[in-house]
Amino acid sequence: MISRLNREFALKTEPERRSAYADMLLSPVMHTDCTNARENGKSCQAYVCATPDGKALYFAREKKGHEGVKGTVTEDYQGILVLVHDITFYNYGSDHQECLAHVLRYLKASMENEPDCTWNKKIHALVQEMVHFRNGCRQPHGPDSEIVSGFEKRYREILETARKEYEDIPVNDYYKDGYNLFLRMENTCTTICCSCMISGYLPRIMKPKGF
């Protein structure tokens, strides 16, 4: 009975899902993730694709990696992908940004484990400021480019502070996550600033229910 209802629901929502799929391909930024789930009592991988306008699609797959990505929006997507560490996703999209919720979490860990550093506190506050500003922006075409450039300038200045601090304070052999985070943020500086300003902000991709 339940199985039949699920099948009927899937068939009836197919037009909506196809429409959402097409719309999501046009979004300048899309979040993607993969998490463990269960389908009909069996373990599977749930692939999630979500855009800032509220659209989200879930795909149950037997395998992770490229086999799991097949048939999802991510496979055909050509914009900026916001993701959590999974090197598979770096083969898709035109550019990549680590999920800001995770970045903020890692920065807090850096603040706790590297109390002598100042860059982590400064950039944590800046990212929060950027997110708050963008979420409060009511301009139809997004913030002015000069505002975005201003955020990027401050961002790069803080990263330069980080570089100098790590030159003065050698990386701890027992905690290298802060330094590695700095390197990732330096590599994706423009992407983080631009995507945060253009697309809005989704805190994180929630684990799907009902699998």
Briefly describe each language-model feature range.
Residues 1-211:
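Catalytic center-proximal scaffold of phosphoryl-transfer enzymes
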